[in-house]
Amino acid sequence: ETELHEICKRLGHELTERYEDNVLPPVFIGVMKGALPFMMDLIREVECPILTDYVTISSYMGKESTGVIKLKKDIDTDLTGRDVVIVEDIIDTGVTLEWFKEYLKNNYYPKDISICVLLDKKCKRKMEIYRLTQTKL
């Protein structure tokens, strides 16, 4: 738990530096349900105004990916002109996050979209992700 706290503290500091001068607070969107504990710990460490929202996206049945992405719960926040941080606990292939990023771009018109992930399983990566910090667990 101490290591997780240190990771959240470091990421929170980096995110604060990135967004503290924003006119419009950034929106942190948690991908439920797995991201909830990480997102709660992370946003406690962000020391600038933010908005939060969440989505529920499914592409798995049990432990296997179906290849079909379903948006089960959409966001409720207007993202127009805002920076967005998608918060996820684990990234595997990246297909679902890439789909969601494009969905947000095409439907909500944010200024910018970043992805913040706790654990990166690089084994089957299908997309590139921007890393705030290189973290090895």
Which stretches of residues belong to each language-model region?
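PRPP-associated nucleotide enzymes
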Residues: E1-L137
